[in-house]
Amino acid sequence: MDITKMPIGFFDSGVGGLSVLREAIKVLPNEDFIYFGDSKNAPYGTKTVDEVKKLTFNAVEFLLGHNVKAVVIACNTATSAAIEDLRNSYKDIPIIGIEPALKPAVELNKKGKIVVMATPMTLAEKKFNDLMAKYKGRSEMVSLPCPGLVEYVEKGIVKGQELNNYLQKKLSIIDKKEISSVVLGCTHYPFIKEELSKILGEDVVIIDGSLGTSIQLKRKLIKNKSLNLQDKKGTVKIFNSLDNNEEIIKISKKLLGII
């Protein structure tokens, strides 16, 4: 089979990775994508590392069963827990992960604190703490674990009073006037960007890693000579692990902007 015409696999613990897929479609409009959301087991951020590894390997096997030419782990928690093991196990296929976009936040050189919102597991993992240590001397960073936020997005709640109350409560431990930027360290969180901006104001820059990951994916495809050069719009197939998944597929398409 012509590798250039093979699809690209995307995986997340639920609907969050669609925020990355949304960017990837813009960067790679000719490619076909297969998206697998493991909403049945969401959220990953409060599970053990071993549990997340097992679920991530199962998801990658599912995608490989669909003859994908590359896999994007569009989940910060799964990247933290499993990316090294995945790359060691699947050496013949590019596996791209995602990490909190600390570098762009630091390079803004804005006065004030950089707040990193993520799941408890992402913030506890060595991979993230090594990344924090790398930039610690250049900016003041505050880690903000957000258990429960993924669940809002999984239900399709991306704005409104209930979500606003949750965010206000989480951010109440930090003086908002001292925040220069917010790094969204979970792929579910870009969907609540609008609500977050309402609370923090327009001067606070909100950054996520979706574009960086999509550009990295394109680089890997070029390197592997597997970029689809056909002049046609690609397709997207969405799968989800929930038993009755009609509603979550509908939410997924809505978040992706295809309905």
Curated annotation (Swiss-Prot):
GO BP term, pick one: regulation of cell shape
Annotated catalytic residues: C75 (proton donor/acceptor), C186 (proton donor/acceptor)
GO molecular function: glutamate racemase activity
Keyword Isomerase part of the UniProt annotation: yes
Binding locations of substrate: D12, S13, Y44, G45, N76, T77, T187, H188
InterPro entries: Asp/Glu/hydantoin_racemase (IPR015942), Asp/Glu_race (IPR001920), Asp/Glu_racemase_AS_1 (IPR018187), Asp/Glu_racemase_AS_2 (IPR033134), Glu_race (IPR004391)
Keyword tags: Cell shape, Cell wall biogenesis/degradation, Isomerase, Peptidoglycan synthesis
Tree of life domain: Bacteria
Functional note: Provides the (R)-glutamate required for cell wall biosynthesis.
PANTHER family: GLUTAMATE RACEMASE
NCBIfam families: glut_race (TIGR00067)
Protein name: Glutamate racemase
